[in-house]
């Protein structure tokens, strides 16, 4: 997907796995917090940031020492990953600056003429991107809000906070996740107030 056009950024790649067990080969440590979240929300719209193992190339992690991993809820996506025999590192199937697609027709509209084929698994269960939570540090931090809310995460983990960059858009802070600093998720609609 990164080859579709210059609109997609390498730092926006998430590693998608078919099974929870696949994560063990990719990350340094899966602590109790990660196990609780994986058991509660996977497969589903939760991306977890871990300290990566050396097997994860810098071009996948954007040069960071962490990697963002999710297990999609869509069975067709998980079957495709399983058939590939390896996790798949890819961004959302959208053009940067546009919302991520939630229906097959959104992908067809955005990607028409840019890709050779589109595998349709059906519409998404949620209308927003996955929540991204960073577990690479002692305090769990939400890097990108999504359909799994701060409150839902707090019920499982106890203390969870929002990353300071979500509260203060400092251009000198390196983004840890897609959509934290850049123009992102902008619908093409006229709005009247």
Question: Where do the language-model regions lie?
Answer:
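Extracellular interaction modules
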Residues: 1-5
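Active-site-adjacent structural elements in enzyme catalytic cores
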Residues: 6-193
């Amino acid at each position: 997907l990164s080859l579709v056009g210059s609109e997609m950024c390498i730092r926006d790649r998430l590693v998608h796995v078919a099974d929870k067990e696949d994560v063990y080969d990719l990350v340094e440590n899966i602590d109790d917090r990660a196990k609780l979240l994986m058991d509660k929300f996977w497969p589903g719209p939760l991306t977890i940031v871990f300290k990566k193992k050396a097997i994860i190339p810098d071009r996948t992690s954007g040069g960071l020492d962490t990697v963002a991993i999710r297990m999609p809820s869509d069975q067709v996506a998980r079957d495709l990953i399983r058939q590939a025999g390896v996790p798949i590192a890819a961004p959302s199937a959208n053009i940067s600056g546009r919302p991520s697609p939630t229906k097959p027709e959104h992908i067809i509209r955005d990607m028409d003429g840019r890709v050779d084929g589109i595998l349709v698994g059906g519409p998404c269960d949620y209308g927003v991107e996955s929540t991204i939570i960073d577990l690479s540090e002692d305090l769990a931090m939400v890097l990108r809000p999504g359909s799994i809310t701060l409150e839902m995460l707090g019920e499982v983990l106890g203390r969870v906070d929002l990353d300071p960059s979500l509260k203060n858009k400092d251009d000198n802070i390196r983004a840890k996740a897609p959509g934290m600093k850049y123009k992102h998720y902008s619908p093409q609609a006229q709005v009247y107030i």
